[in-house]
Design a protein with these regions (language model features):
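N-terminal Rossmann-like NAD(P) cofactor-binding subdomain of oxidoreductases
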Residues: 1-109, 212, 236, 244-245
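Catalytic-loop motifs flanking and including active-site residues across diverse enzymes
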Residues: 63-68, 123, 151, 230
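A generic structural signal for alpha-helix starts
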Residues: 11, 66, 163, 228-229
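Structured loop/turn residues at secondary-structure junctions
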Residues: 8-9, 63, 119, 160, ...
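NAD(P)-dependent Rossmann-like dehydrogenase/reductase catalytic/cofactor-binding core
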Residues: 197-246
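Asparagine-centered polar/low-complexity signal
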Residues: 46-47, 60, 66, 115, ...
């Protein structure tokens, strides 16, 4: 066995995931944020940090971090991010309850299909694992909503440089058509969440709602199929590891 994809949710730290290495696997890719992995990777953002000879327990981060990180990288590279807050409006997941039932998070304990549910997410802070220069600059929260798939990141950030809506969109479009092609998508059509079902990009910028206030405050909306997009990056990561290890 060359690579094990650890998707059970039970082995989300280096110590427990390393049991796969002990059993003969060369690499373990954890399909979630992980505690103490050798490296956390978002494809299209920081895969150059990955060294298959040194890194054996690898985290593919979360679907939300994979959506936020490409946008944050472009904004920080082009304009500089001073600080930012993110909200992910996220389809419900298996961690929630079908009916009101016990859960350590009293809001996630409520029936998932009938309420909008504010809850926590570490996705914004986790961006610093793939973009260390943003350490301490991003935070956020989640609102779980009664849709089965597709989510959207709403990022509001203060920038170092003055800019315009047009300049922000142009920077994101350039990245989507260039270095981040296949990971970041740029679109300006009046679409809704179901239209992105099956989209395999990590992040789909909704350029029609980009806003800049007083030159240095920017708001960017980015959609993501939190199942298909993430699974595709997981596949890409496995391929990248195997190719780089040759």
């Amino acid at each position: 066995v060359d690579a094990v994809v650890e998707s059970t949710g039970r082995f989300a730290d280096k110590e427990s995931a390393s049991k796969h290495i002990d059993a003969g696997a060369k690499w373990v890719i954890i399909s979630a944020p992980a505690k103490g992995p050798d490296v956390t990777v978002c494809m299209g953002v920081n895969e150059e940090m990955l060294d298959p000879k040194e890194h054996k327990v690898i985290s593919n981060a979360s679907c939300t971090t994979n959506c936020l990180a490409p946008v944050a990288k472009v904004l920080h590279h082009e304009f500089g991010i001073v600080r930012g807050l993110m909200t992910t409006i996220h389809s419900y997941t298996n961690d929630q309850r079908i009916l009101d039932l016990p859960h350590k998070d009293l809001r996630r304990a409520r029936a998932a299909a009938v309420s909008m549910i504010p809850t926590t997410t570490g996705a914004a802070r986790a961006v610093a694992l793939v973009l260390p220069e943003l350490q301490g600059r991003l935070d956020g929260m989640a609102i779980r909503v009664p849709t089965p798939n597709v989510s959207v990141v709403d990022l509001v950030a203060e920038l170092e440089k003055e800019t315009t809506t047009e300049a922000v969109n142009e920077a994101l479009k350039k990245a989507a058509q260039g270095t981040m092609k296949g990971v970041l998508q740029y679109m300006d059509q009046p679409l809704v969440s179901i239209d992105f079902n099956g989209n395999d990009h990590s992040s789909i910028v909704d350029a029609s709602v980009t806003k800049v206030l007083e030159g240095r405050m920017v708001k960017v909306l980015a959609w993501y199929d939190n199942e298909m997009g993430y699974s595709t990056r997981l596949r890409d990561l496995i391929t990248y590891i195997s190719n780089k290890a040759v």
